[in-house]
Amino acid sequence: MTRIKLNYFVIGVVALLLALALWPNIPWRNGQEGQLDRIKARGELRVSTISSPLIYSTGKDGPSGFDYELAKRFADYLGVKLVMTPHHNINDLFDTLDSDDADMIAAGLIYNSERLKRARTGPAYYSVSQQLVYRLGSPRPKSFSDLKGQLIVASGSAHMTTLKQLKQTKYPDLNWGSSVDRSGKELLEQVADGKLDYTLGDSVTIALLQRIHPQLAVAFDVTDEEPVTWYFQQSHDDSLYAAMLDFYSEMVEDGSLARLEEKYLGHVGSFDYVDTKTFLSAIDNVLPSFRPLFEKHAGEIDWRLLAAIAYQESHWNPQATSPTGVRGLMMLTRATASGLGVKDRVDPEESIRGGSVYLQRLMQKVPDTIPEDERIWFALAAYNLGYGHMLDARKLTKNQNGNPDSWVDVKMRLPMLSQKRYYPSTTYGYARGHEAYNYVENIRRYQVSLVGYLQEKEKKAAQHAAIEAELGKAYPVVGPGWSINN
């Protein structure tokens, strides 16, 4: 799955021009109270969304997700509190706009012309294609004419519109069902589990789900790349809409939008079934032996990220040894281990402790101008490449008018460290920058798989426990010699 990089300059210019065009329709210019005034008086921006790791989710560290962070920044821009409410059904999202229970929708929704009857859209903040999926191992359809089973999509989704258009123009015999009680993500999971033959999904969601459901396979692209947008009420009052366009222009201009996309989508790349399957098997069979050590020595690092680093380094093999002499779970050099007080590099606890301490030292060493949530990627590049070479990549970025404090800019320069055109002018010389690039991207993918897979296991365990508890209430345990009197 290849994603088209959005032209953020074009987005910013379009947003600015639209904001200027809407200027005459802003009520406060005529002394009237507009939607933006009501939001500020209320002190809340009400946003409808759906629950998804990519879009909006809550955990022990609070809410997260691409749409959540973008909406939170918009609320901060307006000077109000964000109130984000998840809904299960896409139709419910638009009902909240119609009933004025929400000011906008931020739910990773594809642009859909049919929705323009009920709402209007904001600028695109990333793009996806619609794809048909099936379960790996079953016959792969090459077109809709090859479908040999049930096709179901989420009610109210853009996929419904796409299928209607295809039936009218190309596949008159095409049939499908729609589900109001299952989300698009749930339908994708049902295909992966063999409970449903086919469904449609967006390319980004599918790519992320494949990290924890590798048997989910893409049959073919149904559409070209399409924009993902927010939705707003249809209204002659343009006050909120104009503020949103101004906000987008600023996000584009200062690089914040590109950095958010990098944070949530930068690791979405090619899918390796065998590697993913092997990793998930290792989570079940190998990780339990080392998980307590990762949790114990993680420090300021998420233990799951530390575990992902160790898997990239050694595949969780404490006896691992490279031709260059690095050894152990965290593949420490003899010199690094000595400096960290690690006496036995193949001792799992010593190796994990040493690797964690070394990485945290690198994070503290990273320049303060780098944002907090991006420091880890610079530190990981330094962990793999050497701190000096990471600084060279930042210098190259600055010389090429990029932002040396932005990981999305710097990572693109890492491969240049091995190119003769560039490395002679660097301070620390030649380095295998392409390996550091792949190193960090692999770790990010492993972390996504690990977090998602463990969450799925915990969710299923909780559901099983709830069912067992209900069964226990319905059928009380009867001990030997006891009797139940009616």
Curated annotation (Swiss-Prot):
Record's subcellular location: Cell outer membrane
Region (Non-LT domain): 22-268
Listed name of the protein: Membrane-bound lytic murein transglycosylase F
PANTHER family: MEMBRANE-BOUND LYTIC MUREIN TRANSGLYCOSYLASE F (PTHR35936:SF32)
InterPro entries associated with the record: Lysozyme-like_dom_sf (IPR023346), MltF (IPR023703), Solute-binding_3/MltF_N (IPR001638), Transglyc_AS (IPR000189), Transglycosylase_SLT_dom_1 (IPR008258)
One Gene Ontology cellular component: cell outer membrane
Domain description: The N-terminal domain does not have lytic activity and probably modulates enzymatic activity. The C-terminal domain is the catalytic active domain.
Gene3D superfamilies, alphabetized: 1.10.530.10, Periplasmic binding protein-like II (3.40.190.10)
Entries under SMART domains matching the protein: PBPb
